Amino acid sequence: MVIIMPTTYELKIYGKVQHVGFRDRIENIGKGLGINGIIYNYKDGTVRILANFDDEEDKELFKKYIERLEKKDKLIEIEKIEEKRLNTYIEFPEGISRLSSDDILELNKKLDEGVKYIKLIFAELEEHKKVLLEIKDMHVKTVEILSEHTRILNEIKDTLKDIKDKL
């Protein structure tokens, strides 16, 4: 009986992938696909994954799921994924586990990122408020114009009635 050992790969994901919930999504994908490995933020802004794959098809499927995250989550932007086959096999616990070098630092960065997005949301809301106020003003003017037209039409109607009565 031949036992085929999984192959360990390092995947480097470039783009806006740190402090946007990316690693959590990868953990879920890995769990769903039965892939074992670790995931961590690297100091150059990439996210790195060390994972075992039984075959090339599993690895490509995993990468496709990663690439699709960008369509599902507007905070995630993936520029590219690089892969490197490692010359050694690393045995990982079941699933994909997150490594954090400094949980407090990570939390602070995520809070800062969250505040940035909240500010962007408020700026968008202000723009929407301006547009809604403009629409409201146009509505008020339209109602005034329609009221004036209704008054004029009623005058014309009364005048036509008077003419009809005289004939």
From Swiss-Prot:
Domain Acylphosphatase-like residues, every copy: 8-106
InterPro entries: Acylphosphatase, Acylphosphatase-like_dom, Acylphosphatase-like_dom_sf, Acylphosphatase_CS
Top-level taxon of the source organism: Archaea
Molecular-function GO term, any one: acylphosphatase activity
Cited PROSITE patterns: ACYLPHOSPHATASE_1 (PS00150), ACYLPHOSPHATASE_3 (PS51160)
Protein name: Acylphosphatase-like protein MJ0809
Any matching Pfam family: Acylphosphatase
Species the sequence originates in: Methanocaldococcus jannaschii (strain ATCC 43067 / DSM 2661 / JAL-1 / JCM 10045 / NBRC 100440)
